[in-house]
């Protein structure tokens, strides 16, 4: 998605875009599996230290970290240290402004590995899911709640077009 957008925006061929290194903005509270993505896909991790008082990243920090090479922002719903939720709605609002101002298409992935089966049942939470315009995908882990083998997890995309043709497989 990003490479096609970047090529079109900068009048480049697909081959010319291959040398560009995209980045993902996220909290330093990320799960270790993200390291594999960064290494295997040659993506620069733009890591934000969470606030020492809330242990969440702030929308202003995200705004300062994104640029035209940003392929996404990861918001964590239930970090591994204290279970805190990043302020997805606030980050979505900041990205709305940035995307409109700069003609970017930065989306949000909600890493709800730890909070994905808790947050939907909390009535007092601000929107954090597909109700927000920039949330493109949400992941959750089944193995954290028992009843499944280690490593069981799911990811759901809002729209088929946001899932890379290299990832989707029809059987």
What are these regions (language model features)?
Residues 36-40, 84-87, 118-123, 149-152:
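Short acidic, glycine/serine/threonine-rich loops at helix termini
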Residues 1-75, 89-93:
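PLP-dependent aspartate aminotransferase-fold enzymes
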Residues 71, 75, 80, 84, ...:
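C-terminal, well-structured subdomains that either form a transmembrane helix-short loop-helix hairpin
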Residues 30, 79-81, 112-116, 144:
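Active-site-proximal loop/turn and secondary-structure-junction residues that shape catalytic pockets
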Residues 85-123:
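Catalytic PLP-binding core of fold-type I/II PLP enzymes
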Residues 121-124, 128-171:
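Active-site C-terminal subdomain of aminotransferase-like
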Residues 26-28, 76, 110, 140-142:
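Short His-Asn-centered micro-motif
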């Amino acid at each position: 998605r990003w490479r096609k957008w970047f090529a079109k925006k900068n009048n480049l061929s697909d081959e010319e875009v291959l040398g560009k290194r995209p980045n993902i903005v996220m909290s330093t509270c990320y799960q270790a599996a993200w390291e594999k993505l960064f290494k295997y896909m040659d993506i620069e991790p733009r890591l934000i230290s969470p606030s020492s008082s809330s242990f969440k990243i702030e929308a202003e920090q995200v705004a300062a970290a994104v640029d035209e090479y940003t392929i996404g922002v990861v918001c964590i719903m239930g970090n591994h240290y204290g279970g805190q939720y990043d302020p997805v709605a606030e980050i979505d609002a900041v990205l709305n402004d940035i995307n409109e101002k700069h003609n970017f298409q930065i989306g949000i992935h909600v890493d709800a590995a730890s909070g994905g089966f808790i947050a939907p049942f909390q009535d007092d939470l601000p929107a954090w899911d597909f109700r927000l315009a920039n949330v493109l995908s949400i992941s959750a882990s089944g193995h954290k709640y028992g009843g499944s083998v280690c490593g069981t997890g799911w990811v759901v995309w809002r729209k088929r077009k946001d899932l890379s043709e290299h990832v989707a497989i029809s059987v």
